[in-house]
């Protein structure tokens, strides 16, 4: 058996179509009994009992929320697909149902980068 490096696997996956990649993910989920869905953090139950003590802490995770797609809806859909890895149908639905979060729980620098990327495509974006 030939030695296959991690880079070989990455290169192979990079050349797959979205449909092939989706099928691969499904097969891997079934084989290993896992889910590729990102966990959603519950904010309501995690509030500190100290009241103002929580307000003093600096927020470290941010949500990038798409407010509107503007005039360049197709460009925004392309950017949403690139950012989230969603399929065309899912990305289109997300853009059409705005305001919707595009990415949740990201560091501030990444949130700013994503906001600039989406605004460059013509969208109105908010960081929460």
Curated annotation (Swiss-Prot):
Pfam families hit by this protein: Ribosomal_L12, Ribosomal_L12_N
Entry GO MF terms: mRNA binding; structural constituent of ribosome
Biological classification of the source: Bacteria, Pseudomonadati, Thermodesulfobacteriota, Desulfobacteria, Desulfobacterales
Name used for this protein in its record: Large ribosomal subunit protein bL12
HAMAP family assigned: Ribosomal_bL12
Assembly with partners or alone: Homodimer. Part of the ribosomal stalk of the 50S ribosomal subunit. Forms a multimeric L10(L12)X complex, where L10 forms an elongated spine to which 2 to 4 L12 dimers bind in a sequential fashion. Binds GTP-bound translation factors.
Annotated organism of origin: Desulfosudis oleivorans (strain DSM 6200 / JCM 39069 / Hxd3)
Stored NCBIfam families: L12
GO cellular component: cytosolic large ribosomal subunit
Keyword Ribosomal protein: yes
Any one GO biological process: translation
């Amino acid at each position: 058996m030939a030695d296959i490096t991690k880079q070989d696997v990455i290169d192979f996956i990079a050349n797959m179509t979205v449909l092939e990649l989706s099928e691969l993910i499904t097969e891997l989920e079934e084989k290993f009994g896992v889910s590729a869905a990102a966990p959603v953090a519950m904010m309501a139950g995690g509030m500190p009992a100290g009241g103002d003590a929580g307000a003093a802490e600096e927020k470290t995770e941010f949500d990038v929320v798409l407010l509107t797609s503007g005039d360049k809806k197709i460009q925004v859909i392309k950017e949403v697909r690139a950012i989230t890895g969603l399929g065309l149908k899912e990305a289109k639905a997300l853009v059409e149902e705005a305001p919707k979060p595009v990415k949740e729980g990201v560091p501030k620098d990444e949130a700013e980068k994503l906001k600039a990327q989406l605004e460059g495509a013509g969208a109105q974006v908010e960081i929460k």
